[in-house]
Amino acid sequence: MGKRLLSAAILWGLCGSALAATPTSYGWVEKGLIMPTGVAVKMKLDTGALTSSLDARDLRHFKRDGKSWVRFTLQVTDANTDRQVSQTLERPVEHMVTVRGAGGMEQRPTVTMSICLGDKVYEEWFTLRDRSKMIYPVLLGRRLLADLGAVDSSRTF
Protein backbone atom coordinates (compact mmCIF):
# COMPACT_ATOMS: atom_id res chain seq x y z
CA MET A 1 0.00 0.00 0.00
CA GLY A 2 2.81 2.41 0.91
CA LYS A 3 4.61 1.78 -2.40
CA ARG A 4 1.40 2.46 -4.32
CA LEU A 5 0.82 5.76 -2.54
CA LEU A 6 4.43 6.80 -3.09
CA SER A 7 4.19 5.89 -6.79
CA ALA A 8 0.97 7.87 -7.14
CA ALA A 9 2.54 10.87 -5.40
CA ILE A 10 5.59 10.75 -7.69
CA LEU A 11 3.42 10.46 -10.83
CA TRP A 12 1.25 13.36 -9.69
CA GLY A 13 4.36 15.43 -8.96
CA LEU A 14 5.79 14.73 -12.41
CA CYS A 15 2.47 15.45 -14.06
CA GLY A 16 1.64 18.60 -12.15
CA SER A 17 5.07 20.17 -12.53
CA ALA A 18 5.54 19.38 -16.22
CA LEU A 19 2.31 20.57 -17.74
CA ALA A 20 -0.26 23.34 -17.30
CA ALA A 21 -3.63 22.99 -15.61
CA THR A 22 -6.21 20.76 -17.25
CA PRO A 23 -8.10 22.69 -19.96
CA THR A 24 -11.83 22.42 -20.60
CA SER A 25 -11.24 21.61 -24.26
CA TYR A 26 -8.29 20.14 -26.12
CA GLY A 27 -6.74 20.66 -29.53
CA TRP A 28 -6.48 17.81 -32.02
CA VAL A 29 -2.82 17.51 -30.97
CA GLU A 30 -1.78 17.91 -27.34
CA LYS A 31 1.45 17.53 -25.43
CA GLY A 32 1.31 14.93 -22.67
CA LEU A 33 3.52 12.66 -20.60
CA ILE A 34 3.87 8.91 -21.00
CA MET A 35 4.18 7.27 -17.61
CA PRO A 36 6.28 5.93 -15.97
CA THR A 37 8.96 7.47 -18.19
CA GLY A 38 7.73 11.04 -17.74
CA VAL A 39 8.73 11.82 -21.33
CA ALA A 40 6.68 14.54 -23.04
CA VAL A 41 5.29 13.63 -26.47
CA LYS A 42 2.81 15.04 -28.95
CA MET A 43 -0.42 13.03 -28.82
CA LYS A 44 -3.04 13.02 -31.56
CA LEU A 45 -6.64 13.12 -30.30
CA ASP A 46 -8.51 10.94 -32.80
CA THR A 47 -12.29 10.89 -32.53
CA GLY A 48 -12.35 8.27 -35.30
CA ALA A 49 -10.50 5.67 -33.22
CA LEU A 50 -12.17 3.80 -30.37
CA THR A 51 -9.03 2.60 -28.58
CA SER A 52 -5.85 4.56 -27.97
CA SER A 53 -2.61 3.40 -29.58
CA LEU A 54 1.04 3.62 -28.54
CA ASP A 55 4.24 3.31 -30.59
CA ALA A 56 5.77 0.01 -29.49
CA ARG A 57 8.84 -1.49 -31.13
CA ASP A 58 10.30 -4.98 -30.83
CA LEU A 59 7.10 -6.55 -29.46
CA ARG A 60 7.77 -9.86 -27.74
CA HIS A 61 4.97 -11.94 -26.24
CA PHE A 62 5.78 -14.15 -23.24
CA LYS A 63 4.11 -15.87 -20.29
CA ARG A 64 4.48 -14.86 -16.67
CA ASP A 65 2.70 -16.89 -14.00
CA GLY A 66 0.60 -18.48 -16.73
CA LYS A 67 -0.62 -15.13 -18.07
CA SER A 68 0.12 -13.39 -21.37
CA TRP A 69 2.55 -10.48 -21.17
CA VAL A 70 4.28 -8.33 -23.77
CA ARG A 71 7.70 -6.69 -23.72
CA PHE A 72 8.22 -3.71 -26.00
CA THR A 73 10.48 -0.75 -26.57
CA LEU A 74 9.06 2.74 -26.29
CA GLN A 75 11.19 4.89 -28.59
CA VAL A 76 10.05 8.51 -28.87
CA THR A 77 11.35 12.04 -29.24
CA ASP A 78 10.88 14.16 -26.12
CA ALA A 79 8.71 17.10 -27.22
CA ASN A 80 10.41 19.41 -24.71
CA THR A 81 14.06 18.60 -25.46
CA ASP A 82 14.05 16.94 -28.95
CA ARG A 83 16.07 14.16 -27.29
CA GLN A 84 15.48 10.53 -28.32
CA VAL A 85 14.20 8.43 -25.42
CA SER A 86 14.19 4.64 -25.49
CA GLN A 87 12.91 2.41 -22.70
CA THR A 88 11.91 -1.24 -22.57
CA LEU A 89 8.62 -1.87 -20.78
CA GLU A 90 6.69 -5.01 -19.81
CA ARG A 91 2.92 -5.10 -19.35
CA PRO A 92 0.28 -7.81 -18.95
CA VAL A 93 -1.87 -8.21 -22.06
CA GLU A 94 -5.43 -7.17 -21.19
CA HIS A 95 -6.78 -8.65 -24.41
CA MET A 96 -6.11 -8.89 -28.13
CA VAL A 97 -8.08 -6.67 -30.50
CA THR A 98 -8.66 -6.91 -34.22
CA VAL A 99 -8.04 -3.57 -35.89
CA ARG A 100 -9.26 -2.81 -39.38
CA GLY A 101 -7.11 -0.39 -41.35
CA ALA A 102 -5.98 0.48 -44.86
CA GLY A 103 -3.66 -2.55 -44.82
CA GLY A 104 -6.41 -4.98 -43.80
CA MET A 105 -7.15 -6.71 -40.49
CA GLU A 106 -4.49 -6.92 -37.78
CA GLN A 107 -4.37 -8.45 -34.28
CA ARG A 108 -2.83 -6.18 -31.63
CA PRO A 109 -2.17 -6.62 -27.92
CA THR A 110 -3.87 -4.17 -25.56
CA VAL A 111 -2.14 -3.06 -22.36
CA THR A 112 -2.90 -0.59 -19.59
CA MET A 113 -0.69 2.50 -19.52
CA SER A 114 -0.84 5.85 -17.73
CA ILE A 115 -0.55 9.22 -19.42
CA CYS A 116 -0.71 12.74 -18.08
CA LEU A 117 -2.59 15.56 -19.80
CA GLY A 118 -2.79 18.91 -18.07
CA ASP A 119 -2.58 18.13 -14.39
CA LYS A 120 -4.43 14.78 -14.51
CA VAL A 121 -3.16 11.23 -14.87
CA TYR A 122 -5.33 8.88 -16.93
CA GLU A 123 -5.03 5.10 -16.91
CA GLU A 124 -6.08 3.79 -20.30
CA TRP A 125 -6.01 0.77 -22.60
CA PHE A 126 -3.56 1.16 -25.48
CA THR A 127 -3.10 -1.10 -28.46
CA LEU A 128 0.58 -1.61 -29.22
CA ARG A 129 1.84 -1.05 -32.74
CA ASP A 130 4.97 0.13 -34.49
CA ARG A 131 4.01 3.74 -35.24
CA SER A 132 7.52 4.77 -36.36
CA LYS A 133 6.18 5.84 -39.77
CA MET A 134 3.45 7.94 -38.14
CA ILE A 135 3.87 11.59 -37.14
CA TYR A 136 2.53 11.07 -33.61
CA PRO A 137 3.72 8.23 -31.35
CA VAL A 138 0.51 8.28 -29.31
CA LEU A 139 -3.05 8.32 -30.59
CA LEU A 140 -5.83 8.92 -28.05
CA GLY A 141 -9.13 7.26 -28.93
CA ARG A 142 -12.74 7.88 -27.94
CA ARG A 143 -12.61 5.73 -24.79
CA LEU A 144 -10.21 8.25 -23.26
CA LEU A 145 -11.61 11.31 -25.03
CA ALA A 146 -14.97 10.69 -23.36
CA ASP A 147 -13.25 11.46 -20.02
CA LEU A 148 -11.33 14.50 -21.29
CA GLY A 149 -13.92 16.83 -22.75
CA ALA A 150 -14.35 18.58 -26.08
CA VAL A 151 -11.81 18.34 -28.90
CA ASP A 152 -11.33 21.57 -30.86
CA SER A 153 -10.09 20.52 -34.30
CA SER A 154 -9.07 24.10 -35.14
CA ARG A 155 -6.18 24.17 -32.66
CA THR A 156 -3.24 22.27 -31.23
CA PHE A 157 -1.49 22.62 -27.89
Q: Model-predicted segments: where are they?
A:
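N-terminal signal peptide c-region/cleavage motif recognized by signal peptidases
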Residues: 15-17
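Pepsin/retropepsin-fold aspartyl endopeptidases
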Residues: 19-157
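Bacterial N-terminal signal peptides that target proteins for export
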Residues: 1-9
